[in-house]
């Protein structure tokens, strides 16, 4: 496991596992957890290129190059992230061409971070649909970040997988964990 943490708030870890003789890597990015992250969220929303995003792309390019060199071009390598980390992994995927799986991601709006979004799958928490107005569905609960971004015409890159998490659903990664692992022991 490789851990990346910086003074600017960037946090990511590389995980490796061997599954039936096949080596797999996941580079996981942390979401917003302090005010410096919120500043980067706002900067990115308005088209800036925060240092965390630049660092995410630079590290992803270095790691993908090293892994390709060691394991070949078909290395099993993917990115995963939530919120701010979701935006960072989307940018990393567009820079490297490797798959990204996001959960309630921040949009990527900076032109110098955009690329081919075909390898990005975004998982968005939905609450309970209340009504539709002006062609937009209005939900109670669900991901407030995605609701804000879509209502201000800011699109997230890649495919979107809406997951009905129910009335109490929020922006947290815990909601997805509880959905996917309904029968887990606490």
Cite the ranges covered by each PLM segment:
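A conserved cap/lid and substrate-binding interface adjacent to the catalytic center
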Residues: 1-79, 95-96, 106-115
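Serine hydrolase/lipase
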Residues: 17-24, 94-186
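Gly/Ala-rich beta-loop-alpha elbow adjacent to hydrolase catalytic centers
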Residues: 80-85, 89
